């Protein structure tokens, strides 16, 4: 399977089911009353870690993820069925980002985070029944689910990280001690992505990450250095494999110092990790001499002479690896405070003039109110108008200089403002599309009188 450590996904939670508008109509029951049920809740979207996964490749092929919608409410106060939640599985070590801010750092198996909340079901007319309104003709549309664009970044979690210059034999060592089968060839940069393997030694199991070859200048981004070095941040122990022949014009003894410098420059914490040095390719004639030089110069590190190809000395270095891993705690990677999203109290609404002359009203709650309103239901429109008045939206629009005839955009709806400031410092309500003002009792009596006059004339 190919390795992928960055991916962009689009997530949409499920929409809530619509509420039902119905009345109980049965023989011998004169005042049955409202019996419209509520809609079901839309499905939430979670991101959860799974140990068996090692790449984000599958999400790259399926970046659009959408949960199911809740079902509509029914008559006889039947509540619609809520949709099942949707879970996106990712490898351990995945960082979830939104707008450049970290919203979750999933390092342990089974960790999960809610990234998109499903919409609540719209209320049926039974829910609007009150002492003063015993037969409400109003119901709600289901609340839309949250939509969000996320960036996932994987930082490999491993007990042992294999580091070194290209062609030092890291992939050969991994294939020797585990069942992993990375690509192995006699040219540098054979490994372009981290490879993971699980090794077992003396009844101790540990995860090994084969990090692609690091070159001089990697800490400054040379040779995709940043992409490779970030995967070392969460390893517990480092095994530095050295080629006796060196790399290019850098000899084997000097190469140890170069890698140490690159680790320290990229992140000082990397240089503090326990590190074991293994001179690979022990079958080469000059290997023994180079080994003695490294032991003499780097006395603070344990140095081993091995051959990953033949297995010579591998057991000895595995003994040391198990010993060091057992004594080293799992790294606790702290997230920088400057990158953590800090959310304050969101205002109820925000008014923003648009370039085309329209006025946009933003606000999660107020947009949901509009999107959940049936504009073909008179009582629903009146309820929304009263809400606009109570939350102070009308006065705020007047203060912003909104004039009669201006278009107000809220959520997915557009309204034509017909209000003017009155002596009582109140304005008329927005003129809703398709809305007809409720007639007064005097107007209804006048219409009846007009109909009687027409009949008498005939």
From Swiss-Prot:
Mg(2+) binds at residues 171, 191. GTP binds at residues 164-171, 189-193, 210-213, 280-283, 307-309. Gene3D superfamilies: GTP-binding protein OBG, C-terminal domain, GTP1/OBG domain, P-loop containing nucleotide triphosphate hydrolases. One of its GO terms (biological process) is ribosome biogenesis. Its main location: cytoplasm. Residues 1-157 form the Obg domain. This is GTPase Obg. The lineage of its organism: Bacteria, Pseudomonadati, Elusimicrobiota, Elusimicrobia, Elusimicrobiales. It comes from Elusimicrobium minutum (strain Pei191). InterPro entries: G_OBG, GTP-bd, GTP-bd_Obg/CgtA, GTP-bd_prot_GTP1/OBG_C_sf, GTP1-OBG_CS, GTP1_OBG_dom, GTP1_OBG_dom_sf, OBG_GTPase. It comes from the Bacteria. It is found in: Cytoplasm.
């Amino acid at each position: 399977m190919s390795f992928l450590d960055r991916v962009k996904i689009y997530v949409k939670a499920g929409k809530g089911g619509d509420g039902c508008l119905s009345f109980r109509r049965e023989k011998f029951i004169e005042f049955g009353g409202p019996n419209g049920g509520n809609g079901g809740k839309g499905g939430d979207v979670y991101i959860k870690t799974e140990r068996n996964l090692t790449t984000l490749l599958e999400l790259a092929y399926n970046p659009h993820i959408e949960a199911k919608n809740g079902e509509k409410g029914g008559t006889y106060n039947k509540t619609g069925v809520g949709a099942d939640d949707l879970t996106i599985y990712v490898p351990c070590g995945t960082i979830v980002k939104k707008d450049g801010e970290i919203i979750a750092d999933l390092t342990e198996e089974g960790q999960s985070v809610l990234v998109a909340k499903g919409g609540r079901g719209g209320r049926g007319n039974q829910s609007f029944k009150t002492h003063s309104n015993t037969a409400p003709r109003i119901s709600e549309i289901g609340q839309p689910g949250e939509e969000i664009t996320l960036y996932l970044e994987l930082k490999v979690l491993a007990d042992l990280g294999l580091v070194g210059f290209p062609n030092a034999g890291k992939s050969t060592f991994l294939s020797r001690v585990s069942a992993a089968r990375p690509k192995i060839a006699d040219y540098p940069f054979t490994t372009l992505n981290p490879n993971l393997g699980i090794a077992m030694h003396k009844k101790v199991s540990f995860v090994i990450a084969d990090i692609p070859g690091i070159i001089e200048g990697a800490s400054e981004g040379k040779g995709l250095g940043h992409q490779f070095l970030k995967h070392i941040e969460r390893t517990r122990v480092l095994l530095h494999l050295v080629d006796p022949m060196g790399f290019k014009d850098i000899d084997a003894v000097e190469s140890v110092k170069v890698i140490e410098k690159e680790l320290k420059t990229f992140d000082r914490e990397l240089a503090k990790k326990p590190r074991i040095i293994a001179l690979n390719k022990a079958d080469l004639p000059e290997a023994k001499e180079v080994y003695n030089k490294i032991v003499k110069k780097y006395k603070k590190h344990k140095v081993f002479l091995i051959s990953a190809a033949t297995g010579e000395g591998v057991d000895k270095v595995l003994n040391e690896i198990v010993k060091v891993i057992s004594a080293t705690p799992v790294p606790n990677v702290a997230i920088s405070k400057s990158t953590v999203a800090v959310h304050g109290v969101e205002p109820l609404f925000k008014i923003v003039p648009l370039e085309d002359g329209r006025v946009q009203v933003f606000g999660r709650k107020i947009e949901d109110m509009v999107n959940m309103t049936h504009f073909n239901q008179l009582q629903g429109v009146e309820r929304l108008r009263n809400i606009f008045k109570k939350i102070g939206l009308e006065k705020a629009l007047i203060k912003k200089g909104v004039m009669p005839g201006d278009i107000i955009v809220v959520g997915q709806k557009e309204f034509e403002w017909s209000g003017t400031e009155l002596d009582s410092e109140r304005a008329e309500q927005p003129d809703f599309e398709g809305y007809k003002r409720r007639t007064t009792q005097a107007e209804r009596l006048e219409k009846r009188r007009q109909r009687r006059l027409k009949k008498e004339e005939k």
